[in-house]
Amino acid sequence: MKRLTLLPGLLFLMQAAFSQESGSCKPVNLVCDYLVNPLGIDNPAPRLSWMLNDARKGARQTACQVIVDKDSLELIAGKGTIWDSGKKDSEQILITYSGQELRPFTKYYWRVNVWDKDGVKSSSAINSFETGMMGMEYWQGAWISDNKDINYRPAPYFRKVFDARKKIWSARAYIAVAGLYELYINGEKIGNHRLDPVYTPV
């Protein structure tokens, strides 16, 4: 008997959740410079865009707001200390970043709020983008070489031995090569990419 009582309750909750979702204008598919959560961007004013998930007749966005922060928890609280575009009465789904100067080698989190045709606000999931070097003045690397001619045919191995000064929680390796590379740490290949780096126009 309890099972028969709970089942209609569950169906009611599922139906209510579906109705709420189908009746909202939610920003989805967020991209930064047309990339999803990109790494190593060097654009000081990246383009932030999104799509709308709203199947209702006459659905449209009437206003939008983009917030950016280095702490994702700030976005959950509705704050953007790095940039807050403010609420803009606009149907556009692309905004160019115009907040604080982006720092090199930094991960930023961003979120979009939109208002639908009825003035109801809806928020996107939190996405991110990570800056690269952002300028040669930040270059601190030194070339690793085997001191052989560039036409030497066998693929060389470059090895750098170092001791971590503290426990590593997250790290990023920035690599520039004249050709292709694979990165190994303690004998284990890092990542599942092939033929890195990708084609770079001159």
Map each language-model feature to its residues:
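Recognizes extended acidic, P/S/T-rich segments that occur
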Residues: 52, 58-107, 113, 117-124, ...
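Aromatic-lined ligand-binding clefts that engage carbohydrates, nucleic acids, or primary amines
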Residues: 165, 169-187
